[in-house]
Amino acid sequence: MSMASSSSSSLLAMAVLAALFAGAWCVPKVTFTVEKGSNEKHLAVLVKYEGDTMAEVELREHGSDEWVAMTKGEGGVWTFDSEEPLQGPFNFRFLTEKGMKNVFDDVVPEKYTIGATYAPEE
């Protein structure tokens, strides 16, 4: 193998690795802000996802296996009303307008603060 060929292979390998690392670090950020009016039976959350908007958002309470659809309101706020007190921490599953799907577990704690913004651990 010639020196030029070996050097080209090394450069190509480094370029591929750089692209892989860049892709891993460029995952869009998602945040969940608990909105005013949330209480033990009503949860209102503003979901922000960099570069995209939510098409569907589902909620799963702590200890439950059931995902329930949230209702989209004004300004990107998603709400859920329950007859029983809601049990956190809360898990979210969503589909964006661009087709990205994701699940985030235990994002909003049981004892959340109105106006606080929560982000999944990376």
From Swiss-Prot:
Primary subcellular site in the record, as a coarse category: secreted
GO cellular component: extracellular region
Protein species of origin: Phleum pratense (Common timothy)
Keyword Hydrolase: no
Record-linked Pfam families: Expansin_C
Gene name tied to this protein: PHLPII
Protein name as catalogued: Pollen allergen Phl p 2
Record GO biological process: plant-type cell wall loosening
Keyword Flavoprotein: no
SUPFAM superfamilies given in the database record: PHL pollen allergen (SSF49590)
